[in-house]
Amino acid sequence: MSFVPREAVEQAVKEALEISPKRNFKQSVDLIVVLRDIDLRSPQGRIREVVILPHPPKKHVRICVAADGDMAVKAKEVADRVLTREELQGLVGNRKAAKKIAEFCDWVIVKADLMPLVGRTLAPALGPRGKVPIPVPPNANIAEIVKTYRSAVMLRAKDQPQVMCRVGTEDMPVNEIVDNIFKVLSTLEGKLPNARHNIAKVIVKLTMGPPVEVKLR
């Protein structure tokens, strides 16, 4: 992206790290991309894209797997929670329990044949939280999929013309955070009609820190 200089992104990340007050917890580094002239009411204008970052943020990402059989057995070794078919059936009509699971899970990986059941029980609680169930084939390597999604972020623009996601943590090397930012920006570039025009601002900030705008060309 020629209009987003790497040195400008690097400078913004360094400044965000320097000016943010220290907290008694590990802060995330967030990327905010402000868009313009995008019709969010049209299907073409909505953005909902999973991005696998090249450098996983040093913050635990909770992965839940909805599966049965052999996949459920293997998932118990790597996932933060495994939801069996019986547990999903128990969520029918139990919105409170579904919401609790949706709040706990950052990602929900679903064995494909359980998607209809997840759609009826868990998906209504995931949607308002900007989360979606991810279907995988019954013979998928669940350990590899869980590992991959620990590095994943969701790009989403639905109600506001902007995309916000975590691209690192304050204890990561600056160059890794910058790499992650460019992975997000390149993904966005492929989804926008005219990235140079549609991207109005690129902002970096820590969880509790002030925003720092990247100087675009």
UniProtKB/Swiss-Prot annotation:
GO biological process: regulation of translation; translation
An MF annotation (GO) of this entry: rRNA binding
Top-rank lineage group of the source organism: Archaea
The family this protein is said to belong to: Belongs to the universal ribosomal protein uL1 family.
Functional description taken from the UniProt entry: Binds directly to 23S rRNA. Probably involved in E site tRNA release. Protein L1 is also a translational repressor protein, it controls the translation of its operon by binding to its mRNA.
PANTHER family, A to Z: 54S RIBOSOMAL PROTEIN L1, MITOCHONDRIAL, LARGE RIBOSOMAL SUBUNIT PROTEIN UL1M
Protein name as annotated: Large ribosomal subunit protein uL1
Gene (UniProt): rpl1
